[in-house]
UniProtKB/Swiss-Prot annotation:
Predicted to be exported by the Tat system. The position of the signal peptide cleavage has not been experimentally proven. NCBIfam families: TAT_signal_seq. The lineage of its organism: Bacteria, Pseudomonadati, Pseudomonadota, Gammaproteobacteria, Alteromonadales. Its cofactor is NAD(+). It holds the Pfam family Glyco_hydro_109_C. NAD(+) binds at E62, R63, D84, Q112, W133, A134, L135, H136, E153, V154, N182, Y242. Belongs to the Gfo/Idh/MocA family. Glycosyl hydrolase 109 subfamily. Residues 1-33 form the signal peptide. Keywords: Glycosidase, Hydrolase, NAD, Signal. Glycosidase. PROSITE patterns: TAT. It comes from the Bacteria. This is Glycosyl hydrolase family 109 protein.
Amino acid sequence: MAGIDRRGFLKASMASVAAAALAGCASQQGTSATPKAAGKSVMGLVVPKMAEVRVGLIGVGERGVGFIHHFNNIEGARITAICDTDPLVISRAQKIMADYGRSQPAYYSKGQQAYLDLVAREDVDIVVIATPWALHHPMAKAAMLAGKHAFVEVPMGMTIEELWDLVDTAELTQRNCMMMENVCYGRDELMVLNMVRQGLFGELLHGEAAYIHELRWQMKELDRKTGSWRTGYHAQINGNLYPTHGLGPVAQYMNINRGDRFDYLSSMSSPALGRAAYAQREFPKDHQRNQLNYICGDMNTSLIKTVKGRTIMVQHDTTTPRPYSRHNLIQGTNGVFAGFPNRIALENHGRGSFHEWDQDMEHWYGKYDHPLWTRMGREAEQNGGHGGMDFLMCWRMIYCLRNGEPLDQDVYDGAAWSAVQPLSAASVADRGNSRDFPDFTRGVWQSATPLGIVE
């Protein structure tokens, strides 16, 4: 949502971020405690088939505008309602809908609670939420309580309490709450998942994930766009602010929540130097960007231990000058795949010595491309969205709902992956001492069916 009450929202958002950070540090004793279930598990939830999926969009700004295009290009999906309090993006949405020759949906734009009118509509089946982080939890919860399935941008929530609340609400209402981790639908990530399922790397031992993406330029976005609200987090939380893009695929490789789960985490941050230096260089001394105390370390490194003993390194750096990377590394007893750039080394079934990287991916694409990408990859690339992963994610969401199949990601995945943010902040504040992950599945991970290779 591009502009929720503009400056007023930005101040309120900063306050909520500070409260979330303080709550996270104050409530670390007993983070692994499992509350009583509010309803039955939604692991593998299947809902009645929908001939048509009626879509309500909350937030059609920098991120959400893409969903207007994607759902207009997916058979069986129809946008029936749109909410955003920024009149400029509402006008843009109206034009896009007209350009597609579609009937105009209902629009809601008056006040911060306008989304409640959208989720109450009878002609909305799913609510897709692409708003600033602090709004993900209340909007997803409201959608489920109104009988809708919630699809929310990353992260799913910002505190352990929020994450448990969304798990409980999903179980109580028997509604889907999917955090839309689009990177799980990238060609490379899907291929590696297929390789892992076919046993190419042997028994899995270790993974590496990251969000390394220089975004200092967003500090110049003051009244609208992502930087207008995202910059403030660097002055409120010292930890991994944005863990899920790299972590989601690695978690799927390892069958997290479906045979294994995150056990505990230890985290450390480097000094926080880059944001302040950038502000001093790019803005006047009395500018608002020079009034912030940037505390989030330029590089955060967290180590996750799983119940089965595997390890995952997760890094976050949106400040230093370096090439983009999500790492996307998975190491097994027979070899390793690493991304950025893609390369592979195998002891058996490789094409050379495992002492040297094989970087010829065309061979491996030809042999291990995921069936879903083989089927939909060309259409996904034509429709765009981070190389097609965004479109493929949306297509798969609609496909599952129309065909009565469980979603590829569920509320337990969103909770576990998002929990890295508050747990890393608490660990950093405590000299890197470990923090336990809650078992959001309440033990169901031990018997849940692993994510399959769908076509």
